[in-house]
Amino acid sequence: MNIKQAKQEIINTVQAYLTKDETGEYAIPVERQRPVFLIGPPGIGKTAIMEQVAQECGINLVSYTITHHTRQSAIGLPFISKKTYDGEDVSVTEYTMSEIIASIYDQIEQSGIHEGILFLDEINCVSETLAPTMLQFLQYKTFGNHRVPDGFVIVTAGNPPEYNKSVRDFDIVTYDRVKRIYIEEDFSVWKEYAYKAQIHGAILSYLEIKKNNFYSVVSDLDGKRFVTARGWEDLSQVMKVYEQLGFAIDYDFVVQYLQDEEIARDFAAYYELYNKYKNIYRIPEILEGSIPENSMTIKNAPFDEKLSLLGLLLDSLGQEFISYYRKKAAQEDFFEQLGFLRSDLKEGLGSGKEILERQISSYDTMITHRKKAGMIDREQEKAMCAALQALNDCLMALAVEGTGDAKGDFLCVKKLFDEREQIRQKEISDAGRHLTHAFEFLARVFGEGQEMVIFLSELSAGYYSLKFVSECGNDAYYKYNKLLLLKERTQELKDEAMELLGL
C-alpha cells in the first residue's frame, strides 16, 4: 500500500487497540494487540506519518531509532539484589528500568495523557547482541523485566534487505506475532502531503514533468545512487532559505540532497528554467488581472513549459492560501483569549492589564508544554505564537490607552482585534480576486482544455487551496469546475451510448 493508506491503517489500528468495553478494559486484550511492522524503502515518510497519527489521535509519541541503542540501554543496567528463597538468602541479578520504558513514563508525565505510540525505527537492523532482546520485545512487549505500559501501541519500521546490508530477517515465529504492512513509494500520494508541507513550487513542477525522478535507488560500480522523498523535502526547506539569502542554487548544491548526479543535474537545469519562466510570464501581473503580451506565446509552447507556468501560478496563489490559513487560526485563538478576558473583567478579577498579564503567562506556558509533548505541529505552533504576539500587542495598547475600567479596557483590546480582522478580510478579498484572474487568464489563453483541467485538479488536491475555496468561496472556481464536470459527464454518457450500440 502507499504511505497514505498505511497512515490510515495505523490510525484504524490505534483506535481499535485503544477502544474499551463496558467494563473499562481494552476491547482487544493487550496480549492480542500485535505490534505493527512497517516495511518499505528508506525516506518515504514512515517516521513522518507517526507524528501525524499521534497528533490526529491526540496521543503521545515516543520515538527511537533502535540501532542507536546497546543492549544495556534497551533492557537496563544489571544490579545485585538480595532475595530469600526457601529460607535461604541469595544474591540475584536484576535490571534497572530500560531507557525506552522510562522515556514513555516521562512523556506521560509531561503531557498528562496515558495513551500513545511507541515507535521503533530500523527494528530489523539491530546488532547481533541486541537481536534476542528485540525478538523478546516483539513477542512479549517487554524490555528486560519491564513491560510497555498498557495504552501504548507499538509500531516498528524497517527497510527491505535490498536497501540495507544490515537487515536481519525475522523468522516465522516473530512474523506471526506482528501486523506487517508493506509500503511503496507513490508520487501522487506524496504530492498531497507536499502541498500541505509547502514544498517548493519548482520541485512540484519538476516532479509533475519527471515523475520517475521522484524516487530512485540505483546500484552500479560506484555504489548506490539515490533520490528519496525525504531528500526532496529537505532540499525544499533549504532552497527557500537560500533564496531569501540570495545564495546560488546550482548543481553543486542540489547534488548534496539528490544523491544521483543525473537527476541532480537535471533538476538544477530545470530550476534555472523555472526562474526564467517566472521573469518571462510576470505572474504578479497576471494575478492582478493584466495579460502580458508575451503570455499568448505559451499557447503553442511545449507542454513542459505550460506545466511550469501552471506551477508558478499555483505556487504564487498557494502563498496567499497558506497566509489565509495561518491568520485565520491565529485570529480564532486570539478571539478565544479575548472571550476569557471579557469573562474575567465581568467577574472583576482585576484590571485589563492584570488579567492580560496572567493570560499571556498561562498561554505561553501552554504553548511550551504542548510543543515539548509533541502535541502540536509546526503550523499550529505558528498560529499560537501569532495569537500570543497579538495578546502582547493588546497589553502594550492597554499600557498607553487603557482606562482602568472593565468596559474601557475591553473596548481598547477589541479595537485592536477589529483592526487585525479588517486587514485579514482585505487579504481574503485579494486572494479571491487573484484566483479569479488566474482562471480568466487560463480561459483566455487555453480555453477549457487540459491546462484548465490540470489547474483545477491541483487546486482541489492542495490542502490550503481547498481550505480557502471551501471556506471563502470563489465563483470562478465553481464555474469552471461545474463546466468540466458537465463535460466529463457528457463524455461518459456518449461512451455508454456507443457501447450499447456496439460501436
Regions found by a protein language model. Give the residues of each.
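Terminal-proximal interaction/regulatory segments of ATP-powered molecular machines
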Residues: K299-L503
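Conformational switch/transducer regions in large eukaryotic molecular machines and scaffolds
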Residues: P35-F37, C57-T67, I80, D89-G116, ...
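Alpha-helical lid/collar subdomain of P-loop NTPases
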Residues: K196-I355
